[in-house]
């Protein structure tokens, strides 16, 4: 947690397999709109002004590339991180499996004491006929909420949150919970919810 001009900077880094919607997640939240046209492989760093309990913070949002080609470069963005979001797509079972096999071990190696949340993305595709047909052809099905909650508990995540960058359902909750994970003592993080806290955000350009 670093000091900014008049506000504390909170650093949030998003990790996970490629093509699970990490960049769209960040762009939809930062711009309050789903990117309809070109979506870059990696999202530019944005700072969002966040007010929590009357105090102002700058939430820095950092994207990462999930492909193996970036395995050596990706950890360079990890120092000074306050919270990680480990993302998987609820319609990509392989990305769900890789949370435990790839992403948790990587964070344990490079940032063992930093809190992290488990995020299920692309929930708008859970009932999409074409997506379901594709999964059925592979003898697979979407990841359900209970599976996400169970994995979050197994890996020691602060919580499990599902969202859709397209519809923005659950999107604000993702970042509200990320902020709470940073500002709440570790032993209380899992059970602590938004409660009466007022969290207001605006994009800093």
UniProtKB/Swiss-Prot annotation:
A motif (Effector region) lies at residues 38-46. It comes from the Eukaryota. The modification Cysteine methyl ester is found at residue 202. A lipid is attached at residue 202 (S-farnesyl cysteine). Its main location: cytoplasm. The keyword Cytoplasm applies. Signal peptide: none annotated. NCBIfam families: small_GTP. This is Rho-related GTP-binding protein RhoQ. It comes from Homo sapiens (Human). The lineage of its organism: Eukaryota, Metazoa, Chordata, Craniata, Vertebrata.
């Amino acid at each position: 947690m670093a000091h900014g001009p008049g506000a504390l900077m909170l650093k949030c880094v998003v990790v996970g397999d490629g093509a699970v919607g990490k960049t769209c997640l960040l762009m939809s939240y930062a711009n309050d709109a789903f990117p309809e046209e070109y979506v870059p492989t990696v999202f530019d760093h944005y700072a969002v002004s966040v007010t929590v309990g009357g105090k102002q913070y700058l939430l820095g949002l950092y994207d990462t590339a999930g492909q193996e080609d970036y395995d050596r470069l990706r950890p360079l963005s990890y120092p000074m991180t306050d919270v990680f979001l480990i993302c998987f797509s609820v319609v990509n079972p392989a990305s769900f499996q890789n949370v435990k096999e790839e992403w948790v071990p990587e964070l344990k190696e490079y940032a063992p004491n930093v809190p992290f949340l488990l995020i299920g993305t692309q929930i708008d595709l859970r009932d999409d006929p074409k997506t379901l047909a594709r999964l059925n052809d592979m003898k697979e099905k979407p990841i359900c909420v209970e599976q996400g909650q169970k994995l979050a508990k197994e890996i020691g995540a602060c919580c499990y949150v599902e969202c859709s960058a397209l519809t923005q359902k659950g999107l604000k909750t993702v970042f509200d919970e990320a902020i709470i994970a940073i500002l709440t003592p570790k032993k209380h993080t899992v059970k602590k919810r938004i409660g009466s806290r007022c969290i207001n955000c605006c994009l800093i350009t």
